Amino acid sequence: MVKLKNIALISSFLFALNSYSETLIQVDISEQRLYLISNNKVLSSYPISSSSYGEGQKENSFKTPLGTHTIKEMIGSNATKDTIFISRINTKRTASLIKEPIDTENDYVTSRIMWLEGDEEGYNKGGAVDSYRRYIYIHGTQEEGLIGVKASHGCIRMFNNDVIELYKKVNIGTKVLIKA
């Protein structure tokens, strides 16, 4: 069941984006959840992992940026589940998933990539706060045991099955609101 807080956040997001696409994503960092919304209804809810460094916009901060974003690029549509991407290139290797809450030395980007571009000039777009130039993605992870807690280096991590499912439901241009 969606909590009242979620309904208020979703309503404010929909109001702010009423001139955009009907399908939207809201990331609620306080709940470590991602919501897929269409026609004012929550279609799907997924656990996520945002940055262990907290929230922030600055380049090299390793923090998850806040505000309104757009999916600028989608990478990996034909990749097999758990495929490792390095610099957005399919390595043709698959990750061994870690189901325990263990932080490894590897920060593999796996399965799918939805690369985000900030929409708010001076806040998450342009200069030293540009989410796109910071390579902020929604992506799969090898460290599935850490989903639900802050563990990333700025991106939004998801279970591999979930990110593949979400990838099929969104498009380039889908709006993404990231809130603390």
Give each language-model segment a name.
Residues 43-79:
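Electropositive
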Residues 3-10:
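Sec-dependent signal peptide recognition
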Residues 11-20:
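Hydrophobic h-region of N-terminal signal peptides that target proteins for export
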Residues 30-32, 39-41, 51-53, 74-77, ...:
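Solvent-exposed coil/turn segments that connect beta secondary-structure elements
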Residues 23, 29-30, 47-61, 93-101, ...:
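N-terminal post-signal-peptidase region of extra-cytosolic proteins
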Residues 62, 79-180:
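Exported/periplasmic cell-wall-interacting domains
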Residues 22, 29-31, 43, 64-68, ...:
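Extracytoplasmic
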Residues 24-26, 33-35, 47, 70-72, ...:
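Soluble periplasmic/extracytoplasmic beta-strand elements of cell-envelope proteins
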